Amino acid sequence: MKTKLNELIEFPCVFTYKVMGEAKPELVDLVVEVVQRHAPGDYTPQIKPSSKGNYHSVSITITATHIEQVETLYEELGNIDIVRMVL
């Protein structure tokens, strides 16, 4: 029997996205812009460069209110051109 994500998470809850993308100045702004559309708030993302400096990881934490919000953010963050992966 498969357990669905929404059966494991009780909403509202704190949810952190880790977005890895090219080390371009606009990465953080693009991530925050997408998050603001679905979970408006005051965000201070954490940015960490890769060892060679080609990529940055942007961690941003929201208060998720429902599973559709979580899934939509995964999809839209992944659709940003310079993003390579969303965890």
From Swiss-Prot:
It comes from Pectobacterium atrosepticum (strain SCRI 1043 / ATCC BAA-672) (Erwinia carotovora subsp. atroseptica). InterPro entries: UPF0250_YbeD-like, YbeD-like_sf. Belongs to the UPF0250 family. It holds the Pfam family DUF493. This is UPF0250 protein ECA1299. GO terms for cellular component: cytosol. It comes from the Bacteria.
